[in-house]
């Protein structure tokens, strides 16, 4: 038996589910056994991007003791747009505080 963690996060909540599975268990089987799909019905496992320790991984991948399986949410905003928005917010904060920028 091996010990793993299933992780998923929304903007409001982060969940980590510890799980013990057989050494022959695949990623998809572990996710289904964890119950996370019932907690977060918005997860579509057939379309979700998953990874182990921040590295994208296939659903049929084998697991090792200590693996952290992560289920990634789709991006809600283009990364370039998000950076521009954060930069504008920072500039406004500096102006309000009277800092040069």
Curated annotation (Swiss-Prot):
Gene3D superfamilies the record matches: RnfH-like
Family matches, as InterPro entries: Mopterin_synth/thiamin_S_b, RnfH, RnfH_sf
N-terminal signal peptide: none
Similarity comment: Belongs to the UPF0125 (RnfH) family.
Protein name: UPF0125 protein CBU_1303
Taxon lineage: Bacteria, Pseudomonadati, Pseudomonadota, Gammaproteobacteria, Legionellales
């Amino acid at each position: 038996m091996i010990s793993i963690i299933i992780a998923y996060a929304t903007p409001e909540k982060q969940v980590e589910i510890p799980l013990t599975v057989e050494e022959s268990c695949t990623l998809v089987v572990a996710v289904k056994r964890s119950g996370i799909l019932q907690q977060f019905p918005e997860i579509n496992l057939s379309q979700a991007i998953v990874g182990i320790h921040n590295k994208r991984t296939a659903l049929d991948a084998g697991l090792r003791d200590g693996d952290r399986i992560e289920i990634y949410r789709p991006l809600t905003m283009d990364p370039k747009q998000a950076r521009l928005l954060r930069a504008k917010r920072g500039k406004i904060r500096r102006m309000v505080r009277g800092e040069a920028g």
